Amino acid sequence: HPEREMTFIGVTGTNGKTTTTNVIKHILTANGYLVGLIGTIQNEIGDQILHTDNTTPMVYDLMALYRKMADAGCDYVVMEVSSFGLVQHRIGPTHFRAAVFTNLTQDHLDYHKTMEAYYQAKKMLFSITDYALINIDDDYGKRLAGEVTCAMETYGISSKADYYADAIKLRANGTSFWMCYGGKSYPVEIQMTGMFNVSNVLAASAVCMELGLTNAQVLQAVQKCRGVRGRCEVIPTGKPFSVICDYAHTPDAIENILKSVKEYTEGRLICLFGCGGNRDKTKRPKMAKAAAAYADFLVITSDNPRDEDPNAIIQDILAGLAGSTIPYEVVVDRKEAILRGMQ
């Protein structure tokens, strides 16, 4: 039973899981703990990187991974907990010391069929945790906050939350804000940008304080956290323009990243994106509509079509631009599309 030998922190939600889990790991590691990480990009035991196939591994793989982490001396395990993992009972007998709900927006409806079923899948995590931290900027988060039976706190940009952000200043290379809780405010400077990252850092900070770290320990560590590759990642180019790579693959995520970047963009905002194959088709036109609302020019391309025809996927995307006046180009080959976007 390696799951009895470590303390578990779970993070669930449509967007923000990877960044939030990585910031939690960074804070705990900076304060002397050995931490295991289980997530979308990779699994980690301290600095050791392990390959992953699923956000939440199958139960037999997960238990083997737990054993490696326990034998290595991990104090904590921070994991992304997917809706698939919960519905399919992949996490087995794992009990969580703390669990975070980031948000719930359209995704995986090819599997869950309805948003209600998707919500109920996410909610399962909060029946196996001692403490819940819930984002009440999100409508489903507000609902969840009224339904959980464990100890609970809330976070968000809204001042109605237990942990909230004030005086937020976004820049191309970072963000500053005041973290407010318990009637006090603390200045925070992070090397990440985007309103969504303010929310992710709030969540990670609140969880670590719940685990017993002081605000000074948390905030000192947060300032040195650089974020996650492929999550609002600024790519150095040496050119007179900025390039940002982001994982946004839902309508809400597209809107969030473009809305944030738009705030400090000088000149045009060019958005290059595609949609994955063999996944929820109904979000494709919605992603295009979200992109058209904030970008000045779109480059529409292929993004891991799997078994589908890339051109058919692009036609689904273009349906979302009906009636829009935004200029766009279709370049099916992704490498050529990136070159075109740079040009």
Annotate the PLM regions.
Residues L50-S82:
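Conserved nucleotide-sensing/catalytic segment adjacent to the nucleotide-binding pocket
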Residues E5-M6, A72, F96-S242, E266, ...:
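Acidic, Mg2+-coordinating active-site environments of NTP-dependent enzymes
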Residues C74-F84, S242-H249:
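Switch II (G3) loop of P-loop NTPases
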Residues L321-Q343:
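C-terminal structured "cap/appendage" subdomains that terminate the fold
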Residues H1-N43, Q48:
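Walker A (P-loop) phosphate-binding motif
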Residues V228, I254, L258-S324, R334:
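Active-site beta-alpha connecting loops in nucleotide-dependent enzymes
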Residues V11, I38, L62, E80, ...:
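Residue-level signal for inorganic ion chemistry
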Residues F84-G92:
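Conserved helix/coil segment N-terminal to the catalytic DExD/H
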